[in-house]
């Protein structure tokens, strides 16, 4: 039996409207009451995820910004790995002149965007988290957990992915969390490596973990865990990368809570 359960949020545990269903909430409460360790493992910001956790009234570790931040059961920061200042600073302005691509910055407890995009707020049904606008060149590049780019066109983000990888190589970890969101963290940062650290803290190893995800930013975690489950609605790129992993249902069908109940509560 896996003693640690790690799950991504958007596209995985959350419903398509970015909320936790009553069924999912009840499942997590039952699971943690049984002594199973639940871990949020997401690209979201820790301020946002902390509110989701507190609303659930459960104790859980939080892996946020795709592994660049880890908080313990009491919300204390126990791990942080920031982008190098020079890289963060350059990323702030790399596509500033492209009106189709929005640049987002997670810096310590803050969220910045280079221009208004009200539709981004659709992700915040379970928490209150507001962005501030920034000007490239005026934002201090210290404490940046990730920079991410959103665009309605996946095709526009592909050359950006290639350019960032070509320029900085293993100093960065670049991945698509969704087809319309390209995320950049420091090299060596991933949900998988963060999960390894959390499992160790809890007295377990990766083989004692089961993980759920749907994006390329989940790839390391799904392959490193004792068992990785890919959502049915996941990127084809992820399914092709790990054909050995089990594909389950979709977040629209509450596939993760159903799977967890079958595994732990039936």
Curated annotation (Swiss-Prot):
UniProt catalytic activity: pyridoxal 5'-phosphate + H2O = pyridoxal + phosphate; sugar phosphate + H2O = sugar + phosphate
GO cellular component: cytosol
The record's free-text note on cofactor binding: Magnesium. Can also use other divalent metal cations as manganese, cobalt or zinc.
Binding site for Mg(2+): 8, 10, 214
Cofactor: Mg(2+); Mn(2+); Co(2+); Zn(2+)
GO function terms (MF aspect): magnesium ion binding; metal ion binding; phosphatase activity; pyridoxal phosphatase activity; sugar-phosphatase activity
InterPro entries named among the record's database cross-references: Cof (IPR000150), HAD-like_sf (IPR036412), HAD-SF_hydro_IIB (IPR006379), HAD_sf (IPR023214)
Activity profile over pH: Optimum pH is between 6 and 7.5.
Chain residues that bind phosphate: 9, 42-43, 191, 217
UniProt keyword Ion transport present: no
Keywords linked to the UniProt accession: Hydrolase, Magnesium, Metal-binding
EC number: 3.1.3.74, 3.1.3.23
Pfam families membership: Hydrolase_3
A biological-process GO annotation: response to stress
Protein role: Catalyzes Strongly the dephosphorylation of pyridoxal-phosphate (PLP) and moderately the dephosphorylation of 2-deoxyglucose 6-phosphate (2bGLU6P) and beta-glucose 6-phosphate (bGlu6P). Also hydrolyzes both purines (GMP and IMP) and pyrimidines as secondary substrates.
Family statement drawn from the similarity comment of this UniProt entry: Belongs to the HAD-like hydrolase superfamily. Cof family.
Protein name, UniProt field: Pyridoxal phosphate phosphatase YigL
Native organism taxonomy: Bacteria, Pseudomonadati, Pseudomonadota, Gammaproteobacteria, Enterobacterales
């Amino acid at each position: 039996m896996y003693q640690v359960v790690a799950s991504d949020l958007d596209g995985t545990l959350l419903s398509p409207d970015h909320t936790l269903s009553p069924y999912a909430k009840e499942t997590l409460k039952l699971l943690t009451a049984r002594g199973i360790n639940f871990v949020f493992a997401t690209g979201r910001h820790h301020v946002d995820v902390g509110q989701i956790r507190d609303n659930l009234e459960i104790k859980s570790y939080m892996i946020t910004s795709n592994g660049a931040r880890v908080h313990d059961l009491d919300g204390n920061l126990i791990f942080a790995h920031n982008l190098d200042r020079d890289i963060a600073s350059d990323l702030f302005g790399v596509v500033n002149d492209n009106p189709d691509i929005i640049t987002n910055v997670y810096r310590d407890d803050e969220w910045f965007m280079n221009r208004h995009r009200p539709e981004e707020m659709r992700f915040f049904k379970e928490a209150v988290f507001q962005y501030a606008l920034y000007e490239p060149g005026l934002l201090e590049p210290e404490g940046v957990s990730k920079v991410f780019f959103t665009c309605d066109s996946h095709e526009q983000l592909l050359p950006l992915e290639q350019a960032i990888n070509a320029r900085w190589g293993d100093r960065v970890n670049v991945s698509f969390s969704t087809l319309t969101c390209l995320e950049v963290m420091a090299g060596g940062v991933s949900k998988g490596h963060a999960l390894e650290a959390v499992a160790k803290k809890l007295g377990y190893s990766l083989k004692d973990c089961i993980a759920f995800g749907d994006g390329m930013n989940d790839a390391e975690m799904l392959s490193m865990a004792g068992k990785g489950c890919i959502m049915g609605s996941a990127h084809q790129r992820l399914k092709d990368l790990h054909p050995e992993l089990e594909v389950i249902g979709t977040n629209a069908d509450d596939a993760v809570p159903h799977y967890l109940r079958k595994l732990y509560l039936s």
